[in-house]
Amino acid sequence: YKRQVYEREGAGYFLKNFADFFAEDDLTVVNLEGVLTDNNALYPRDKGKGDDGYWFRGPAAYAKVLSAASVEVASLANNHAFDYGAQGFRDTIAAVEAEGLGWFGTYNKNRDPETEKFYFYTKDGVTICLMSLLWDDYNPQDPNGNGAYLRQQITEIKQSGQADAVIAILHGGQEYGRHRTKPQTIFTKMAISAGADLVICHHAHVVMGMDVINNRSAFYSLGNFCFGGNRKAYQENKNRTPAVQDAAPALMLRAVLTFDDDGTYEGQQITLYPVQTTGIDRAAGDTVQVNNYQPKFITGPLAAHVLHLSLIHI
């Protein structure tokens, strides 16, 4: 169905409500969660879940959805980047680069070296490094040593002078959970102690709380944004634990980092914008909200509710 919408409406349809907003900033960054490939010979990677797993893919042309809306960079460190194996990942990189977008991400420190990449952005003599990492939230012992690897990379980048500020995007947590997990807390504190100036987490699909650590902001989940995984943006499901009830509302974050004349980092100003993943509102009493794949800004009581969720520190 998403492909029908793409063919009927064009690439500019999906992020139409944000294109002008994104064009105002220096850099728009998204978490691209899925495989973009035209290779029909690729098969879904075995996730050990039988038919219960989720595999996300779309044609390479879907990268135009990002470029059409002034998105400049995509993080590829997430649990769906390898849904169709290493070749699917490489095809995604090719699709993104063909649209002039940058990308970054470390899927796992033991993966193919080509999957490790940081993104450096320089303006007015100041350089910001974007890095992202996926970890196994179901194995908090971190057998792959990703935590130590993350700390090492941030420390090296800051101490070597490669970047004046580091933004770490971490992928992990409990899907549809309202509270941060222990590994989330550990990895976030580890990143900031190593020198990260801003930490943003993804994976939960719903809005979680935030924290301030050593004058650095940490956001544990912004929720979904333009999400094609479900035809229904909201469907009350009391049989699932936790119940899926607030997957439509989400947050978009704008960060303004300030530096002195010598390029020394001075501070940050964070603005949160309440959004929802669909342009179709849910009427009072409805247990289903249709997803038209066109997120929009929201205001009023729902926006206030979403902002309240971001203030939960538990």
Q: What are the language-model segments listed below?
A:
Residues 2-311:
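Acidic, metal/ion-coordinating pockets
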